[in-house]
C-alpha cells in the first residue's frame, strides 16, 4: 500500500491494475485503518479517474457475494446519492414502474446515508423483505421481475470501510461507485450522479463493465436524478459510443418543478408518496417519476425514444402493473424460499 500512497501524495494517477490491487488491499482485514483513511483522502484530493474507478469496482465485485448470473437482460437504476436535496425515493419508486413495463430490475441500494430515507428503509416500510440471498434474488428476478440487493449484505468486505467513511465524514470515491458495484451481470443501466464532472468517467466505467446501453444523468441543481427544475446534463452509452448532451423537461411536456417541491421525509412519509404515485395519483412526484422512468426505459432500449419511454412509464402506472409488481415483491420476498437455497 505504501507505494500507492506515495504516488497519490505526488499527485500521480494510479493505473487500472494498480487501483485493482489497492482495492483488494483496502478490503484486507490486516490493513491499518489509518492507511485506508489516508488512501481515500489522498485519492479524493487528487481527483479520481475512470481507470481508478473501474479498478476499484473490479476489486469490489470480485469480493462481493457470488451470483450465477443466468438472468438475462437485467437493469439497475440506482443513483449515487449524496446530492443533499432530501428528495423522496425517486429511483426506488421508478424501479417498480420499470418492472411494470416488463424490465427486469436488480435494484442495488442501501439505508439512508445523507438522506432521511434510503431505498432499504423505504422498502422495509412498504413490507418488502430486503434480506435476500443471491439465489433468492435470482428467483425474484426470474419470477417477479424485480429484486432488491441490500448493498451491505452483498459486499460484506466493505463493513470496515463503511465505519472509516463515517468517521472521515468527507466524500470519497465510495460516494460514486455504489451503482457500479451491483454484483448482478447487468445489460443496461440508468445512473444518477451528484457530481457533474464525473458524468463522462462514470459512463466510461459502464462501457468497461460491458453495458449494452446506459444513461448517466446529473439533474438540474446537481441532483442525482433527472430533475424537472431545468436543464439535465446527460451522457448516453449506446452501440459502444458515448455521447454527451442535455435534456430539458419542458420538451417532454412537463411543467417546471423546483427540487424543493419534491422533498421527502421519513420512511412512513416516503412510503405514502410512493404508494400515491404507483396508485396513479396526479402530482409533482408522479411527473418526476415519469421523467426518470421514461429516461430509464430509453436507456434500457425498451423505448426507442425518451417520449416513448415516458408513455410506457405512464401506462405501467395507470394500468396498475407497477403497483402489482410492488405487491408481488412484498409477497414473494417474505415467502420461505428454501427451494432455491
UniProtKB/Swiss-Prot annotation:
Pathway: Amino-acid biosynthesis; L-tryptophan biosynthesis; L-tryptophan from chorismate: step 2/5. Binds 2 magnesium ions per monomer. It catalyses: N-(5-phospho-beta-D-ribosyl)anthranilate + diphosphate = 5-phospho-alpha-D-ribose 1-diphosphate + anthranilate. Its cofactor is Mg(2+). Anthranilate 2 binds at residue 165. Catalyzes the transfer of the phosphoribosyl group of 5-phosphorylribose-1-pyrophosphate (PRPP) to anthranilate to yield N-(5'-phosphoribosyl)-anthranilate (PRA). This is Anthranilate phosphoribosyltransferase.
